[in-house]
Amino acid sequence: MIIRLRFYLSLTLCALSFALFSQEFSISGKVMDSNNTPVELANVVIFTEDGTTFFEGTSTDENGFFKLNNLLESTYLIKISFIGYEDFEQKIILSGHLDLKTIQLNETPESLGEVTVIAKKPTITRKPDRLIFNIENTALTEGSTLSVLKNTPGVIVSEGNINIKSAPATVFINNRRVQLTSDELMQLLESAPANSIKSVEVITNPPASYDADSGAVINIIMSKNLVTGYRGNAYTNYTQGVFPRYNVGTSHYFKNNKVNLNVNYNYTNQKINRDQDDVVNYLNPSNEVEEIWRSNVNRNTWSETHNLNLNFDYYIDDKNTLSLTSTGLYTPYFKYQIRNNTNITDANLNFLSRFTADNLSRDNKYNIGSDLIFRHDFDNSANLIFNAHYTTYDYKRDQDVLSNFFDQNNVFNDSSEFNTAANQVTEIITGKVDYSLPINETSSFEAGIKYSNVNTDSDITKLDIINGSEVIDPNNSNAFIYDENVFAAYSNYSKSWEKWDINLGLRVEQTRIEGESVTLSEINTQDYLNWFPNVSISHQILENTSIYGSYKRSITRPSYTDLNPFTFFLNENTVVLGNPNLVPSYRDHYKIGTNFLEYFTVEAYYMNYDGDIVELPRQNNETNVISYTPTNLDKKVDFGFDFAFDYYPTNTWNLYFVTSFYNISEEANFGEGFVELDQWSNYSILQNSFSLLEDRSLNVNFTLTWVGKNLQQLQTVEDRLFSELSVSKTVLNKKGIISLSVEDLFNMQDSDLRLGYLNQSSSSFVDSDNRFIKLGFRYNFGNTKLNTNERTTSAEERQRLKDLN
């Protein structure tokens, strides 16, 4: 199906390029109901033969009449739809002016009844720069948005991170970046229902219109709407993991000829558990084990979160639209407790001492981002978009840490206690202008400019408790002021002819940064200009065979918190450090691939990182302190080969399989020696999707994802198996939907990490709260055929917000 789509698309684009030399025809007809009454304002749309590419569209007049002009000789698919009627579809061969006479639409008692033929379009679509995962009307849409990403081919969600294979991914919704901290992003995706999602695009080669630091992109496409009216829903989910957690929410959408209004709210209450076993081998100058520290760490997180999203569109006239988007997240209650019990032995496992550390943190934060957007459409189909964005982010954390120390006889002999107070206020202002011009039927041009400013003011105060009184620790108290300005411009050109498609883009960014450590009286500045080209090309060799390739250069800037020189204590022997000397990381990404025999795809890729930014645990063998600090690797290379198979054994069963064999190598110089590590690994996914019962009202999805032993940030991560089963069933005349999902069926998603190079030797086993069962219910009311204008705020700079921890 994928190859056939590419073939027809190429033929169509080729035909359009010679439109001036070809004869044009028309299609006309009259739409009536079963009572022989004209159906006014019915949507009449012409697609390519396979129904995937839109050509022309119109609406019927008051007499039910329609006419589509300027059509070339070809085979088309015509679709006619109107609220309350079953859709009409017919394949037509156009070789002259065609009058379809009278077309009758039959009434249907269910407004959603027509959305059942899921198997007519493929689940997976591949393009030179992206993979499109279509999930509309599957069981996945009754889970959370995070669950959808976990089932998306190539995407790995683990330990609060979202990666496309080994590369961190940036999340967009309807081409607008989700601007939250990493923790907030996970909360949002877990609490947001997936019922409005149409597809997920995994973009490995984003065009130049994306910021250069976007890297690999996950773009969540929401269903679009052509119908006026009101729609709403209310939903709730209950999840049982180690502890119970629940989520409730409601969505409301209204549309008329002048206004689109969409409001979403949800509330999440959860307690998350995490158990961790750590082993650190502290070494002597000869790199022989001197002491072994074994720690059992239990982490519990309690939180209450409110999410509110507002989208408003005002259609001034046919050419001008004004939009307002606002996203707010408020966390009034967040408690984070760490209980640590560490036993210390010598190399022969003889007990030497132990200590306990209890860390209790309480957070309060809000994050509000808003966009004001104006769009003007020109008569030549070009458009001009102005976008202004503002974010305000406020974060506070109070922490209490108590450590008790025991001697060789396990007798208490000392204790220490300290408190910290951390604050961070961030403001982001951006403005951009984008211009898009269709040059002709086969080519288009895009260009744009952007300015962004980020200002962060943060401080931390450490208070030692001595004889019951708080005493400021000046060596670990500080204030940090950060200011960043980025000026950017881009252009993009795309062209299709005969059996070729090409896209060329270039982006330039000028960055100016100043970071001031107030207490240390240190100022660090960076000023650099970078060029970021990208290109993708595809060629249809045969009807069922195509080849493609792409290249993109991108940048990863350090987060504002990573550049902050603060020292944040988890306990007396474990700290998190910022690094004001971090520099940006650059990535060159090459890819070639082929689609053949309709069901198969083979790809090869190569990614070279210069200065990849990673957070490493570094042990000090003299002070017995573990420091987690971000640093730049000298070099990282990731290359591999992918094989994909997408097939429908029946019209109600889709089978998708992909396997990837890849190698990651990392190099770093820490002063005491040069480190070079590499590891071959395998990533495989097997996904089965079923639509059951006569009305296709029961949907089932089962996914297995295997991630073999691999290298991440100079650490070896052992094999893991991710699994998820999701089921959904429509009830109450298709107004209600019951969903059930189970994750980590085989209890194999936990992380087992090992680190060993130079004078570093440690391991960690992390048992996360990712094995659970979730039960959900959603009830729809109003005009359920409506789809929303849901989107999120767009300032890419918000993605680099991080909490102080």
Give residue spans per PLM region.
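Face-selective signature of the C-terminal outer-membrane beta-barrel domain
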Residues: 307-331, 354-516, 544, 600-604, ...
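N-terminal periplasmic accessory domains that precede
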Residues: 100-104, 146-148, 187-188, 202, ...
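Outer membrane beta-barrel strand-and-loop segments of large Gram-negative receptors
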Residues: 428-432, 473-478, 583, 589, ...
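Surface-exposed extracellular loop regions of Gram-negative outer-membrane beta-barrel proteins
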Residues: 512-514, 543-589, 604-625, 745-758
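Short, acidic, small-residue-rich periplasmic hinge/interaction motif at the N-terminus
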Residues: 32, 43-47, 81-85, 95, ...
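Outer-membrane beta-barrel translocator/receptor signature
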Residues: 211-218, 226-277, 303-306
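Short acidic/polar hinge/loop motifs at secondary-structure boundaries
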Residues: 157, 178-204
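Short, acidic Ser/Thr/Gly-rich low-complexity loop/linker segments typical of extracellular
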Residues: 49-65
